[in-house]
Amino acid sequence: MVQPRTSKTESPASAPGASAQMDDVVDTLTSLRLTNSALRREASTLRAEKANLTNMLESVMAELTLLRTRARIPGALQITPPISAITSNGTRPMTTPPTSLPEPFSGDPGQLAGFLMQMDRFMIFQASRFPGEAERVAFLVSRLTGEAEKWAIPHMQPDSPLRNNYQGFLAELRRTYKSPLRHSRRAQIRKTSASNRAVRERERERQMLCRQLAAAGTGSCPVHPASNGTNPAPALPSRGRNL
């Protein structure tokens, strides 16, 4: 009896089916990888947009805080009494001495010293209007414009330590807008002081040498007073002049 050869006849038919299934699996994996890559790019774009929106929100909140400060302080700083406060006989009630508002500071280093002087004078005459550090900082910021105002915006945020620290705010303002002319003058003063010290040191050495020559009897050398730093020390006497 001849056995049927079913296994050999089915084998060629099953090979194309397996190959088709493998192709489907490969296509599915490729599609998943492409989808995953697209989702990652979209997520990265969304994160960048979120960071940008967060920065914009922080900037808007800081500007809003600054605008609120500007709106609150000038209204409270009324230098002269209103018309309704004038009495019937035309006299004004006793008030604090009139003081003009400090000129706005836009970031010019050459104007910083004058601006801070005006601020100090104003706050001295209107001390009752600044009960705390926050009010002093807020008023100073209200007189900033241009580049200086942009610099102050981050320091007016709620988490800024300088918002309630007037002296710290002044120190940071001076560090940011320090005058180059003032620093050049300080450098010149330090250079002149060092030169004066060198002149005085040479004068002390000259006097010591004169004493040693006089004690040894090798020659006389008058002891002059120490130089004050403005004129050079007298030259040592030369023994070869009489030769």
UniProtKB/Swiss-Prot annotation:
Keywords: Coiled coil. InterPro entries: DUF4939. It comes from the Eukaryota. Residues 29-69 form a coiled coil. Residues 1-12, 85-94 have a biased composition (Polar residues). Pfam families: DUF4939. Widely expressed. Residues 1-22, 84-105, 218-243 are annotated as: Disordered. Belongs to the LDOC1 family. RTL6 is one of at least 11 genes called Mar or Mart related to long terminal repeat retrotransposons. They do not correspond to functional retrotransposons, but rather to neofunctionalized retrotransposons genes. This is Retrotransposon Gag-like protein 6.
